[in-house]
Amino acid sequence: MPDDFDAIVVGSGPNGLAAAVTLTAAGLRVLVIEGAATVGGGCRTEKLTLPGFWHDVCSAAHPLAMASPFFRQFGLAARGVRLVSAPVEFAQPLDGGRAAVVTRSVTETAERLGADGRAYRRLFGPLTDDAAALTELLLSPIRRPPARVTPGLVPFSMNGLRSAAGIARRFRTPEARALLSGAAAHGMLPLTSVPTGAVGLMLTTLAHAFGWPVAEGGSARITQAMADAVTAAGGRIETGHWVRSLAELPPARAVLLDVTPRALLAMAGGQLPVGYRDALRRFRYGAGVCKVDFALAGPVPWLNDSCRQAGTLHLGGTFEEIAAAEAAVAAGRHPDAPYVLITQPGVADPSRAPAGCQTLWA
């Protein structure tokens, strides 16, 4: 392959690889450059603890691998990637052995919520029925109003512009309020802030419509399939090459940077408008996260059976307790009882660990 390209992609996370897949499929000459030894960015799988235990380095559950327009067209299954879901998509343990539980079925989930069952069905039924159109809209560039109003767009717009705390007022039971808080807390914002309503609604809708699956064998299977598609179409991938400046890149008609704001400023600052450079310097990263990988001798003995069957768990207690924890983080304090996101890949994918053992992502 010649050393001049139609496009160079710096960074091989899922976004960078998606760009490379799209460009090579169009017949363009593409070079992907990755600083790490392997492709994938946060979507990688490595042996981080004991022999025989495979752990996802960052991303673990992948509802958007089922839902996004790109992946629906890319066809992971046809490329040998199996996405597998646990019997329970996510659960949230509560005191006394109780739990808030979300399964693929809106009806089954609602039946577990007692007095809040009807309100839950009214909220998530229309959203789930229209999940594909909603996902495509939310993942598209915001250039113009949608060409058509789909059935789920109106209820999502009305509720998605509210905070999780505002939506939670629809519910009376601790279980219904808790499951909304666990999903909304993925936004890493106070639950009184407006974006958290949309986060909670969309993630719960995805659980019902597509599931929260893991990739059999590890998240790296997803990005490796994307990398294989790039090279099969004539693209080239270089790993172990940290780009310090755009000046070191070979000639290309376009350069796409799948990097952080600070990395963009470092490698391209001199070629960016002054106002944009200042915006990059002012960019504030979100709250810090500590992630721990466990190699377990067996499954976690949760008190609630549904928690033992869950692929993902949200720890933190009731809506009020999780709201207090997220508010403390936003105020720059360490909460006494932090919100903890857990994935149990082995519930759906026993291949991650030796027989009888499991991995835990927390």
Feature map (PLM): residue ranges:
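Helical element adjacent to the flavin cofactor pocket in flavoenzyme catalytic cores
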Residues: 202-247, 253
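Helix-rich C-terminal "cap"/substrate-channel and partner-interaction subdomain
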Residues: 121-146, 263, 338-361
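Mid-domain catalytic core of redox enzymes
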Residues: 235, 239-354
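Residues forming anionic-ligand binding surfaces in small-molecule and nucleic-acid pockets
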Residues: 196-207, 355-358, 362
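Rossmann-like flavin
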Residues: 95-195
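Short, well-ordered coil/turn residues at beta-beta hairpins
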Residues: 11, 170, 258-259
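N-terminal glycine-rich phosphate/pyrophosphate-binding loop and immediately adjacent elements
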Residues: 3-133
